[in-house]
Amino acid sequence: FYNKRRQELNSGIKPNKAHNILVELEKSLEINIITQNIDNLHEISGSSSIIHMHGELNKVRCIMDESHIFEWYENLDETHKCPHCGAQMRPHVCFYGEMPYQMDEIHNLAMECSLFVSIGTSGGTYPAAGFVSLFKEMKKPTVELNLEPSLNQSQFDFAIHKPATVAVEEFKNLILTN
């Protein structure tokens, strides 16, 4: 499954306009992207501060030492071993039931930032779906940019419900003029 997804990603899938607008915003504002997506479209578009809380398709890691993470663009099978310890390698992707990656770093960023913007999510996947509650508790403004209202839409202070490419551009225009 992950080999097929990796091949699809590396066959020329491109970032969309929303990815590119985030890069544009990054020139004027401090932006930290926390993504549940396992593609690298934010990196391809040029964003610089990205946390992949569910991992990345183009990386693998050792099953014995999670700090042994490697770039990987080929098919992965049981013959591929960790060059440090010889253990089996696996996709660097958060499997169902596993704790997402870098949660401490995400929490630290939440404490420092002044605005939370959620883009293109159903609001049903935890712990990410709970981020808006964390920001509400800290009395920080929250924005939802989504095709339709998310499951936790009532917790957002402001929303634009349109395709991400349209919603992100409208948000950019609002934020840069205020």
Tell me what each language-model feature is.
Residues 1-178:
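Conserved catalytic alpha/beta core of Sir2/sirtuin-type deacylases, generalized to analogous enzyme cores
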